[in-house]
Amino acid sequence: MLIVLSLGGSILAKNLDPDRFLKYADVLRKLSKKHTLLVVAGGGEAARNYIDTARAVGADEVTCDYIGIEITRLNAHLLAAALGPDACPEIPTNYLEASKAIRPGKVVVMGGVTPGQTTDAVAAILAEFLRADLLAIATSIDGVYSSDPNCDPSAVKYDKISPEKLINIVMAIEMKAGSKSPVDPVAAKIIERCKLDALVMDARDPVQLEEVLDREAAKKSPISCGTWITTKI
C-alpha cells in the first residue's frame, strides 16, 4: 500500500524534543517495511514563531510563507536524521523529486513546497500525484467534528464523512473567528477532486499511529481516534 502521511509539526516537533523524533522514526521505520511511505512534515510552533517575527519586522506574506516552508524542511531533516539509513538521503523540494526518491523499504521525508499551501495541502497533492492508496493526516485532533469542538461543546464527531460534506464543514469552521478546522480547505478540495481515501487522526501517541495505519488502513473500519474521509458511505 502506498501511504502519504501528513505529520503535523505540533505533534512531531513539539518543544523540539529529540525523543519525539526518534519515537516517530521508529514507527515509520516499521511501517516502511510493509508499505511504501512518504511523509510530509509540518512546521509546528517553531514555524508560527518565525512567521510572527517575520511579520513584526515587516516581511510580506510570501516571504513569511517561504520562512514557514524552510522550517518544515528543517523538521523533515531532523526526522530523516532520526530514521538514519531507513530514510531516503535527500529531502525532496517538489512532487517530482518526491516520486523519484521512492525506494523499497525507505521512507521519503519532505516539508513544504509552495507559498500559500499548508503541509496538509502538500500531502494531499502528493497523494493525488502518486495515486496513493491512502492519505493520512496525523494531528492532535481525534477526527472531524460538525464544528470546532474547542469552541462548541455540542460538536459531534464523525466516524466517516464524504469529501463533499468535509468541505462544507471546513468552510463553515474557517469562517468563524477563533475556530480551527482539522483539515486545510485546499487539502479538502484536493481530496474531493481525486476521490482520495483519507484519514484524519489523533497521532500524539506514535504507537497509536502505527497501530491505526498498519491494522486499519486496509479495512476502512471506524476508529476511535479518527475519521475516515471516503466516497464509500
Swiss-Prot record:
ATP binds at G9, S10, G44, R48, T139, Y145, D148. Its EC number is 2.7.4.22. One of its GO terms (cellular component) is cytoplasm. UMP binds at G43, D65, V113, T114, P115, G116, Q117, T118, T119. GO terms for molecular function: ATP binding; UMP kinase activity. Homohexamer. This is Uridylate kinase. It comes from Methanosarcina barkeri (strain Fusaro / DSM 804). The gene is pyrH.
